Amino acid sequence: MSDYHHGVQVLEINEGTRVISTVSTAIVGMVCTASDADAETFPLNKPVLITNVQSAISKAGKKGTLAASLQAIADQSKPVTVVMRVEDGTGDDEETKLAQTVSNIIGTTDENGQYTGLKAMLAAESVTGVKPRILGVPGLDTKEVAVALASVCQKLRAFGYISAWGCKTISEVKAYRQNFSQRELMVIWPDFLAWDTVTSTTATAYATARALGLRAKIDQEQGWHKTLSNVGVNGVTGISASVFWDLQESGTDADLLNESGVTTLIRRDGFRFWGNRTCSDDPLFLFENYTRTAQVVADTMAEAHMWAVDKPITATLIRDIVDGINAKFRELKTNGYIVDATCWFSEESNDAETLKAGKLYIDYDYTPVPPLENLTLRQRITDKYLANLVTSVNSN
C-alpha cells in the first residue's frame, strides 16, 4: 500500500501515566452448610454472588451454618459476598458426620474437572466476576479446614479468620495457635452469644462470621489499613467464655492471648474484638493490617499495569509506569493508608541482556501504618505549679 496521501492524517500517541484504581477489598467469601437451603439460589459447590445479604437469608433455610452466618454478616454491613454451599456429612454418629463434612468443605477436583468446597473459591472470580478477599468457614473451621483455608487465602491474596476449634481454656488456645504460621490467618477465641430466632433462645454465635462482616464494614468506612480490633460488634449479647481484660492492668487473660497471636473478645461500650496479630512466623507481618496492606498494594499495582504488557520497552514506557505508581503512592499516603512509599527504576537490575529478553524490573518500597497497640502515658507529680498559684493569688 502506498504511503502517498493528499490531505490530513491523525496518528494517536497514547503516552502518559495511567490512573491506578485500588482493588476492591470488602468482598466476603465463605463456605457453609444448609441442607434445606433453596437449591437454585445456593447450588452445591458453586460460588454464588450475593449483593443483598439480608434478602438472601430467606433462601438460606434454617439448618446448618448458612443462615446464621449470613445474618451475622448482615448485622455488621452490606458487603458483596460469595457463598459456597457444601453438603452435610452423613454417618452413624456425629464424629463420622463431621469428618465427612470437613472433607466436603476442604473439597477436591471432581471427575468433570470442577473444583469443590474451599477449592472452588479459587474459581470464584471467573464465575462471579469478583474476587473474595475476606474468607472464613464459620462454625465448621476445624484445624483441618483452617489449614486448607490458609492455602486458599495465600493463592487469592485474601485474609482468613478462624476459631480455636474445640478449645475450652486459655492454655489450650495458646497451644492451638502454634498449629499455624501463615500471615493470612487470624485466630479468634472465644465466640459470642446472640439470640437465636429459630430456637428462641440465647445460643453460641460464631465470632468468625461477625469478623467477616465487621472486616468488610471497616474496609468500607475506614480502610484496609485499620485492624479488626476495638470496633463495636452488632447483634451480640454476650461472650461464650470468661476472659479477664482490663484497659490498664497487664498480664490479663486478654494480654496472654494477644501476646500469643490470638484475638479475643471483650465487653467495653458493647462487645469488641481485641487483638491485631496474625499467625505469621515473619515479624514483618505481625499485624493484620501489615498483611492486608501488602496484599492490596501488590494486587493494585499488578492489576493496574496489564496495559503495559507487550508494549515496546521504551524510556517513555518506563517513565510512565514509575510516575503512575508514585502518583498512586502519593494518593495512598495523603489518605492515610500508608506512611509513605517510593517507586524507582534500577539500572543495575535492567541490563542489556535483561531488556533484550523482554524483561523489565520496577522497584518500590512502602511503609504500612502501625496500629497503636500499646499506649504509655508518663505521669509525674511535681510542685512547680504551686509557685504559679501563689503568684496568681498575689497578682489579684
UniProtKB/Swiss-Prot annotation:
| One matching Pfam family | Phage_sheath_1C
One GO CC term on file: host cell cytoplasm
Subcellular location, principal: virion
Q: Where in the cell is it found?
A: Virion; Host cytoplasm
- Any idea which UniProt keywords this protein has? Host cytoplasm, Late protein, Viral contractile tail ejection system, Viral genome ejection through host cell envelope, Viral penetration into host cytoplasm, Viral tail protein, Viral tail sheath protein, Virion, Virus entry into host cell
Instruction: Report the record's Gene Ontology biological process terms.
Output: symbiont genome ejection through host cell envelope, contractile tail mechanism
Is Zinc-finger set as a keyword in this record? no
* KW Ubl conjugation (keyword) present: no
Origin: domain of life: Viruses
Coiled-coil regions listed in the entry: none
Q: How does it assemble?
A: Homomultimer.
Its annotated function is as follows: Polymerizes as an extended helical structure around the baseplate-tail tube complex. During ejection, the sheath shifts to a contracted form, thereby making the inner tail tube protrude through the host cell envelope.
What family does this belong to? Belongs to the myoviridae tail sheath protein family.
| Listed name of the protein | Tail sheath protein
